[in-house]
Curated annotation (Swiss-Prot):
Lineage: Bacteria, Pseudomonadati, Pseudomonadota, Gammaproteobacteria, Enterobacterales
Key words, A-Z: Metal-binding, Oxidoreductase, Zinc
PROSITE patterns: ADH_ZINC
Necessary cofactors: Zn(2+)
Induction description: Repressed by RspR.
Gene (name only): rspB
Cofactor comment: Binds 2 Zn(2+) ions per subunit.
NCBIfam families the record matches: PRK10083.1
Organism: Escherichia coli (strain K12)
Keyword Transcription regulation on entry: no
Binding site for Zn(2+) 1: 37, 59, 144
Name of this chain's protein: Starvation-sensing protein RspB
Length: 339
């Protein structure tokens, strides 16, 4: 089989490997589609602090089970599945309270362990989620990005009457917008970004107001309009955003952070405590695959609005370059694998 391997930062190769055999409790997935994420680019370029090399990247992937290991029902062969990349121990403190995404021995497929940019992938059977026949392949491969939005909104608990500010109209920001509008029916969703084309995408995904904040600070715009967001979600992940979010937020608001920067964020306790703000962080997803599969089955989210490009997996280097360089027109890039 062929696999996409990052041998070391900035060194990508398509290599020939033996087709793996699933061990006890595992299934083998013949991969059909995979999605490129920012973290794949970061691993490729050497900017992900958690990655170990050499590494087969890819944590968004979909395919068909073609073999099972001991202890897995043979009836699962032939199942269409999307794979949850979060592999956890199941018994540490985070796992015991429903947060396998921060397991003390967390392994993320495509980061800590080999992922799905390969013609075949062996994964824990419990991580392979069956996809209803009514859900198309290209939607199924988008489940993992939407689980990020499910995790974020699980923390933020949006209501219809919230005024929500989403920083960032990249792929994750747009999944969050779709969930806010399609699942939670939030009446007022504001998106801030510095690229007009991305803001247009935000409108297509349901944003009520899309603001280019490259020239005028959000504080000025919101003061003029009398707006105080009750929920702020940082999908741009810059360390400067927390300070601004605390200033902009309504009293009793919630703020959800997703960034992994090692740079400090300057924030004053008085700004947080004076308004009794609730600040959450969100990493990966905590058992959100069934939730997103249900949303897809009910037509509450529209993954097709985010897919802009598709490449054969053997052109992955071109696909990643496009993803990195064309932020105006490129949103979600899919890789196809041989039938």
């Amino acid at each position: 089989m062929k696999s996409i391997l990052i041998e070391k930062p900035n060194q990508l190769a398509i290599v020939e490997r033996e087709i793996p055999t699933p061990s006890a409790g595992e299934v083998r997935v013949k991969v059909k589609l995979a999605g490129i994420c920012g973290s794949d680019s970061h691993i490729y370029r050497g900017h992900n602090p958690f990655a170990k090399y050499p590494r087969v990247i890819g944590h968004e992937f979909f395919g068909v089970i073609d073999a099972v290991g001991e202890g897995v029902e043979s009836a699962r062969v032939g199942e269409r599945v999307a794979v949850d990349p979060v592999v956890s121990c199941g018994h540490c403190y985070p796992c015991s309270i429903g947060k396998p995404n921060v397991c003390t021995t967390l392994a993320v497929l495509g980061v800590h362990a080999d992922g799905g940019f390969s013609e075949y992938a062996v994964v824990p059977a419990k991580n392979a989620w069956k996809i209803p026949e009514a859900v198309a392949d290209q939607y199924a491969v988008m489940i993992e990005p939407f689980t990020i939005a499910a995790n974020v909104t699980g923390h933020g608990q949006p209501t219809e009457n919230d005024t929500v500010l989403v920083y960032g109209a990249g792929p994750i920001g747009l999944t969050i917008v779709q969930v806010l509008k399609g699942v939670y029916n939030v009446k007022n969703v504001i998106v801030a970004d510095r690229i007009d084309e991305r803001l247009e995408k935000a409108k297509e995904s349901g944003a009520d107001w899309a603001i280019n904040n490259s020239q005028t600070p959000l504080g000025e715009i919101f003061t003029e309009k009398g707006i105080k967001p009750t929920l702020i979600i940082d999908a741009a992940c810059h360390p400067s955003i927390l300070k601004e979010a605390v200033t902009l937020a309504s009293p009793a608001a919630r703020i959800v952070l997703m960034g992994f920067s090692s740079e400090p964020s300057e924030v004053i306790q008085q700004g947080i405590t004076g308004k009794e703000l609730s600040i959450f962080s969100s990493r990966l997803n905590a058992n959100k695959f069934p939730i997103v599969i249900d949303w897809l089955s009910k037509g509450l989210i529209k993954p097709e609005k985010l897919i802009t490009h598709t490449f054969d997996f053997q052109h992955v280097a071109d696909a990643i370059s496009l993803f990195e360089q064309d932020q105006k027109h490129c949103c979600k890039v899919l890789l196809t694998f041989s039938e």
